[in-house]
């Protein structure tokens, strides 16, 4: 609007000729001049404002340009990193392709080699199966030969065993037949062809089976009640009565021991058990008089003088034979092992030590069976030339 007014005033002044201006008065010229100056000043102010606005806009655009430059630089850096990453991934892809091709070639080669080896192994298996069949046939033939030899040997052994049994029946008189599986050793005077001698020789040839049988026998000793194994087989009446009286005395002592254990401390029991050994208790169990008269059958009886001086409650019995003494010691050890004490203490035997003691008891039984061959007096107390040992 000011530009339009200024332009209109300029046109007015420019169109007015000099003659007309000269005709104007001073007042009109002064008004015209002031009016033009005001218009000029307003135009100058407006122009200045416009320049400020332009400068402000330029500053904003410059800031925007700088920000865009920074963003562009970042994007260029990211683009460069992505290019490098793409190159790296492409290299890895190429390497993976090469590696996969190499693995494929290796797999084909290994598969062909495995097929060849499988074929070779199948051929070897066929050869081994053929050899196994031939060995089976050879083993069957050898078994048949062994069975034939066993039959021939059993035939010869049965004839010799009949002769040996006849000689034993004549020697022992009215003694009962011998139980081969009673756990004791066989007689050393038996014939070489008898079944007992053949069985003993068979055990020597197979020590592993003999050891396993001995362990089974020693473990079975604890499973049998004491009254089944306390009396040996074939003893005469005097020895049997003596053993029964010993059993009654053992029961009485066990009852006394239980009463003492109820009224005493564990320390006193431990000292008492340390002080008494199995053989010492057996010697205190049945003290026998020393003055006894021998009998013809190997047993003895108590004289009236000594029997009258026996303590009260003691029943006079016959003297125990030597074989019975050893047998009772063995039975005493077995009973001590079988007895389960309610209170455990430090002196208890371990399972290994118990097995060793049982094995020693079995050896004593075998020794007693062998000792009867050299002592006729003991033979009279035995039936079948043996004791009945632990089963």
Swiss-Prot record:
Spans annotated as Disordered: 155-238, 278-303
Predominant place of localization: other
InterPro entries for the chain: CCDC85
Gene Ontology CC, one term: bicellular tight junction
Amino acid composition bias (Low complexity), ranges on this chain: 182-194
Annotated localization: Cell junction, Tight junction; Cell junction, Adherens junction
Biased composition (Polar residues): 157-175, 280-303
Keywords recorded for this protein, A-Z: Cell junction, Coiled coil, Developmental protein, Tight junction
Coiled coil: 19-86, 116-146
Entry similarity comment: Belongs to the CCDC85 family.
Protein name (database record): Coiled-coil domain-containing protein 85C
Organism per entry: Xenopus tropicalis
Lineage of producing organism: Eukaryota, Metazoa, Chordata, Craniata, Vertebrata
Gene that this polypeptide is encoded by: ccdc85c
């Amino acid at each position: 609007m000011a530009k339009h007014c200024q332009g209109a005033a300029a046109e007015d002044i420019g169109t007015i000729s000099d003659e007309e201006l000269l005709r104007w008065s001073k007042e009109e010229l002064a008004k015209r001049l002031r009016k033009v100056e005001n218009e000029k000043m307003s135009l100058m102010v407006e122009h200045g404002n416009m320049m400020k606005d332009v400068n402000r806009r330029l500053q904003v655009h410059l800031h925007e340009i700088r920000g865009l430059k920074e963003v562009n630089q970042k994007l260029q850096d990211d683009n460069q990193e992505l290019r490098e990453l793409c190159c790296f991934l492409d290299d890895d892809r190429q390497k993976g392709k090469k590696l996969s091709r190499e693995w494929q070639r290796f797999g084909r080669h290994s598969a062909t080699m495995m097929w060849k080896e499988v074929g070779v192994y199948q051929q070897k298996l066929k050869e081994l199966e053929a050899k196994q069949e031939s060995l089976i046939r050879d083993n069957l033939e050898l078994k048949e030969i062994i069975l034939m030899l066993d039959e021939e040997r059993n035939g010869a052994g049965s004839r010799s065993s009949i002769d040996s049994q006849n000689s034993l029946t004549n020697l022992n008189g009215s003694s009962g037949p011998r139980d081969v599986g009673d756990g004791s050793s066989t007689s050393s005077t038996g014939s070489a062809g008898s079944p007992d001698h053949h069985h003993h020789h068979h055990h020597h040839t197979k020590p592993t089976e003999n050891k396993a049988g001995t362990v089974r026998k020693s473990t079975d000793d604890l499973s049998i009640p004491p009254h089944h194994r306390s009396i040996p087989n074939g003893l005469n009446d005097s020895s049997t009565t003596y053993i029964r009286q010993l059993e009654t005395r053992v029961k009485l002592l066990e009852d006394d021991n239980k009463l003492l254990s109820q009224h005493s401390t564990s320390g006193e029991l431990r000292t008492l058990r340390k002080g008494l050994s199995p053989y010492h208790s057996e010697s205190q169990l049945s003290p026998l008089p020393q003055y006894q008269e021998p009998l013809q059958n190997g047993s003895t009886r108590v004289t009236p003088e000594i029997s009258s001086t026996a303590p009260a409650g003691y029943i006079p019995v016959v003297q125990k034979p030597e074989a019975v003494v050893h047998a009772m010691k063995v039975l005493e050890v077995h009973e001590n092992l079988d007895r389960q004490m309610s209170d455990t203490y430090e002196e208890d035997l371990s399972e290994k030590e118990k097995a060793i003691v049982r094995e020693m008891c079995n050896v004593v039984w075998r020794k007693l069976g062998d000792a009867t061959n050299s002592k006729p007096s003991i033979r009279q107390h035995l039936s079948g030339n043996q004791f009945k040992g632990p089963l």
